[in-house]
Amino acid sequence: MTELKTFISATGSEIVRASRNGDGDWKVLTLLSDKGVTCLADDPGNPGIIYAGTQKQGVWRSDDAGLTWKASGLDGQCIKSLAVNKHNSNVVYAGTKPALMFISSDGAQTWRELESFRQIPNRWWWFSPAEPPDFRPYVMAIAPSPTEPDLLLAGIEFGAVVRSEDNGLSWSSHIHGALRDCHSLKFHATDGKWVYQAGGSGGGAAVSPDLGYSFLKKREGLSKHYGIVCASDPVDPEVWYICVASSPFKAYGKFPETYLFRSDGHSGWKPIGWAPHPLHSSPTALVTIRDTPGHLYAGLMNGEVWQSCDYGDSWRRLPFNLKRIWHSLLIN
């Protein structure tokens, strides 16, 4: 396995980047400090290319693994989610508040709205209790398929999980079994049949084994049912992880109480973590690395990053702090 040397987080206000030099020392930089950075996405085919979404200042792009940045369109939009097509790195998706979808076919140089997203059935009642005073819904997650070039899913907070088979030209209604309050939505790294979800409704966890056509709620063994974030093992699609809490206040409040679990597909959820439950700083990002089974990284709201190399059975805290990790953590 290639040694990982760069960790990049979106804090909700800026980017924090930790990198290790040849002597093994870590250097932490703060970037885009005036942009209100909300989300990140990397290009799976070009590890140095990273995109950042911001509050009202559009999309930004880095070509050097997050060291320098340039504005890359959608100025004035509140970007809530970003993703790169896994088969064509020029194709980039952006989800916004209010809940709209945009696509770029040239690496975020130009953008166009996917207008059919406005026509999704029953979207009139979507709303987000998480962001007063307007409570407008937003696209919290975009999940492109690793095996089907034109297949992607989008998760709304709060409203629906929807599916497109034509690269966003048309969209389904809400997918049966999926959690309407979507917080995290991810395809498996290589097996495109599997999709995983964490959400604030329906028990907190759901999984699809059929390319996202339908979802099954997975509650057995979960002590709490407000899902915060999920991830899957990069090799075994039946192994996946979720962080849950009893409520949004226990997930994101001043005194968090959260719970981290692993499922292997053969039994209920098993508690894991570096401390007894409940954990007192929320894991808001879970990351696995392609071709490294058993490896899991947890990024916490307090900026800590914890690493497990054995499916979450044991952990070590990495020797740097990213200030705050708000849903987005990239590792190179």
Regions found by a protein language model. Name each.
Residues 2-332:
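Beta-propeller blade termini and top-face loops
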